[in-house]
């Protein structure tokens, strides 16, 4: 059972990204009057981007910024007109105002467009002007820092806003491809970013936050950036100071985010150089956990209640003149309701980031059951082939009966691990539980615009909040799964009494979360499936800690079998379902449930084998479940002729094992374990045959 690692390539590159699933498609899109208005508005905007008048070019860039924010339909229309190429040209405009607005528009495109549009920007040469901006911004920033009175406040504000836009674009590009990352590495961006963090007291939090986010992303598995940070003691001291700073009453969501990002960067560059004073600090226990744990107490239910209240009773909306007659747009003109919604979303994103870092901490905890077996060579395989006849006749003495049936003892856990488990499980479960806004309706086309929804009986929807909530649920479940996996336990033998009660108590809430996810009908099925997989991982971890004690219900078994047998289901999902079932089957008071699960696990190898990894797990669990022939439910294995089925499956199992591609990622480890399972099956069959029961 593998832990969920933090995978940069798979992580959504931008926390502001809202899924496109709520956009009308096909005939619905064509029939939408608002869609027709957008088409009419796009053409004059594109024309004015190339106007000879500075005011018109500025207006057009600002209009793009406003139109595309959380509005994928308009963004796609503009993309079709090559808005990316037109805006990149405007970065070289003779007017600084046009350049600033163009950078803001490109920044918003990065945020809302995702990987594809970032790749388009990179391919169309956006790095060339961005590289030229870095020294210019550095020079102006230094001038303002040295002499704050050297420039009016409005000019300073424009410098900070422009810097934030450029940094955000670079951050998004860095996660687009290795090619883009290498291009960013070549411009030595780390000193530029660290300057904002070092001078954070004198600068707006928004630009410091952008610099911290970019630094965090660049330091993920990126040796050039890591080395650049580790080489300067001032940088490390700055990151430690930010991470350990005490929260003040005036801190907002960005202040929290900056601390969490600095902590994440410290983890990315660890271990710290031995020559530095900070090298002796245990970053996880001394910095990360004290910083992150209090953040997990944030109530999603309260946040959703505030969002719904804001959506239901918003202030009087601002006038919305036709775009064709509008004056210069101002993206900062936000209503109080919009500011509330953005504040809550930022808080959710900080929470998601904290969970991401905590997941990494749990992923790096030592595995309780390391694999130490060596690969079986060809000579051993030939010996196994010669064992088939002996196994069928039950005359093999290769495995002693006591060895075959000896259960593992309960692994020990230190008191700090137990305390951490007891503290985090309730917090993570609360963050894993779906809210009324976690999954939007398939017919919901609401965007971030505030509208009076009091006339309808349906709950108000807000896609940005929904997107953030789903991300929090996934991160919390993955973190919970890693936490449970890091706790020493085994698939057989006695369970650890120190955490048994908390695991048993957590099981109903975790199962309820999965059931809520499965019965929901969101517009974004991929995201729901992602949450479901994460929930199964957490349930597996809980089931292992409470193995044989959790009382299984028929609903549990039926649901897990249904998920595992779904058409096109991923092997990893099957593995999780099989793992949960294997733990549920070991409750000695539920003999009928055990019978149903045993028959299902045997179906993975007989009459025809299923996918390799789930089959290996099913066989391994069958051995664990029926290792003690004196158990109350052993009659189920005997009545199902389990020994004969396993004996007859040895040739099939051998083919599965040999079919594992060791060249693929994880192939070597899977082959080692598969060889172990095959050997265990052979020994188990021999042992059961000798019992003559």
Spans of features found by a protein language model:
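Eukaryotic acidic, Ser/Thr-rich intrinsically disordered low-complexity regions
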Residues: 300-304, 308-309, 336-341, 362-363, ...
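Elongated alpha-helical scaffolds that mediate protein-protein interactions in large eukaryotic proteins
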Residues: 30-41, 48-59, 63, 67-85, ...
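Acidic, serine/threonine- and proline-enriched intrinsically disordered linkers and terminal tails
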Residues: 2-35, 139-159, 287-471
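Fungal eukaryote-biased detector of long internal structured cores
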Residues: 114-116, 122-353, 357-373, 441
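Extended, charge-rich low-complexity regions and/or helical-solenoid scaffolds
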Residues: 2-5, 481, 485, 489-665, ...
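Short inter-helical turns and helix N-cap capping residues of alpha-solenoid HEAT/ARM repeat scaffolds
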Residues: 52-53, 94-95, 138, 159, ...
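Buried hydrophobic core positions in alpha-solenoid tandem helical repeats
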Residues: 44-46, 83-89, 121, 126-137, ...
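Alpha-helical solenoid repeat architecture
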Residues: 58-72, 86, 100-115, 158-179, ...
């Amino acid at each position: 059972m593998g832990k969920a690692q933090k995978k940069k390539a798979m992580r959504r590159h931008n926390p502001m990204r809202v899924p496109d699933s709520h956009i009308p498609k096909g005939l619905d899109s064509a029939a939408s009057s608002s869609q027709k208005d957008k088409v009419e508005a796009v053409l004059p905007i594109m024309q004015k981007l190339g106007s000879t008048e500075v005011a018109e070019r500025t207006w057009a860039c600002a209009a793009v910024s406003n139109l595309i924010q959380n509005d994928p339909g308009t963004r796609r229309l503009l993309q079709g007109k090559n808005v990316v190429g037109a805006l990149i040209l405007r970065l070289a405009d003779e007017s600084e105002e046009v350049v600033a607005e163009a950078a803001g528009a490109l920044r918003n495109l990065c945020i809302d467009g995702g990987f594809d549009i970032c790749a388009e920007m990179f391919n169309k040469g956006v790095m060339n002007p961005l590289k030229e901006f870095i020294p210019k911004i550095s020079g102006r920033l230094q001038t303002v820092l040295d002499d704050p009175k050297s420039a009016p406040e409005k000019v300073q504000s424009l410098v900070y806003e422009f810097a934030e836009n450029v940094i955000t674009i670079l951050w998004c590009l860095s996660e687009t491809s290795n090619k883009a990352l290498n291009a960013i590495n070549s411009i030595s961006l780390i000193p530029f970013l660290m300057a904002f963090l070092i001078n954070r007291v004198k600068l707006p939090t928004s630009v410091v936050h952008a610099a911290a986010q970019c630094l965090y992303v660049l330091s993920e598995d990126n040796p050039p950036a890591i080395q650049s940070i580790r080489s300067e003691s001032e940088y490390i001291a700055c990151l430690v100071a930010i991470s350990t700073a005490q929260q003040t009453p005036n801190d907002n969501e960005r202040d929290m985010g900056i601390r969490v990002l600095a902590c994440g960067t410290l983890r990315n560059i660890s271990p710290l150089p031995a020559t530095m004073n900070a090298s002796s600090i245990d970053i996880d226990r001394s910095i990360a956990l004290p910083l992150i744990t209090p953040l997990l107490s944030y109530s999603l239910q309260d946040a959703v209640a505030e969002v719904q209240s804001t959506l239901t009773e918003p202030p009087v909306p601002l006038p919305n003149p036709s775009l064709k007659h509008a004056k210069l747009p101002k993206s900062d003109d936000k209503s109080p309701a919009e500011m509330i919604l953005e504040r809550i979303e930022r808080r959710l994103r900080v929470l998601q980031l904290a969970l991401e870092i905590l997941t990494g901490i749990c992923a790096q905890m030592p595995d309780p059951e390391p694999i130490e077996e060596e690969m079986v060579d060809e000579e051993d395989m030939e010996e196994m082939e010669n064992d088939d006849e002996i196994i069928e006749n039950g005359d093999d003495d290769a495995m002693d009966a006591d060895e075959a049936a000896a259960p593992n003892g309960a692994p020990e856990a230190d008191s700090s691990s137990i305390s951490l488990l007891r503290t985090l499980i309730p917090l993570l479960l609360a963050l894993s539980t779906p809210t009324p806004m976690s999954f939007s309706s398939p017919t919901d086309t609401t965007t971030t615009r505030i509208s009076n929804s009091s006339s309808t009986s349906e709950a108000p929807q807000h896609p940005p909040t929904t997107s953030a909530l789903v991300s929090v649920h996934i991160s919390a479940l993955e973190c919970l799964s890693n936490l449970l996996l890091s706790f020493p336990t085994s698939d057989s033998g006695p369970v650890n009494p120190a955490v048994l009660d908390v695991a048993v108590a957590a099981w109903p809430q975790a199962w309820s979360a999965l059931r809520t996810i499965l019965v929901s009908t969101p517009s974004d099925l991929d995201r729901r499936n992602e949450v479901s997989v994460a929930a199964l991982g957490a349930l597996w971890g809980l089931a292992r800690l409470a193995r044989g004690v959790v009382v299984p219900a028929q609903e549990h078994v039926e649901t897990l079998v249904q998920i595992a047998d779904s058409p096109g289901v991923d092997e990893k999902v099957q593995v999780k379902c099989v793992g949960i079932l294997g733990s549920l089957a070991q409750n000695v008071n539920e003999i009928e449930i055990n019978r149903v699960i045993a028959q299902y696990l045997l179906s993975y190898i007989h009459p025809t084998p299923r996918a390799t990894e789930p089959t290996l797990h099913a066989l391994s669990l069958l051995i664990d479940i029926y290792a003690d022939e004196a158990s109350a439910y052993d009659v189920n294995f005997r009545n199902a002729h389990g020994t004969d089925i396993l004996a007859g499956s040895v040739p099939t199992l051998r083919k599965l094992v040999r079919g594992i591609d060791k060249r693929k990622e994880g192939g070597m480890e899977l082959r080692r374990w598969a060889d172990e399972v095959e050997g265990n099956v052979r020994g188990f069959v021999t042992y059961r045959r000798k019992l003559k029961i």
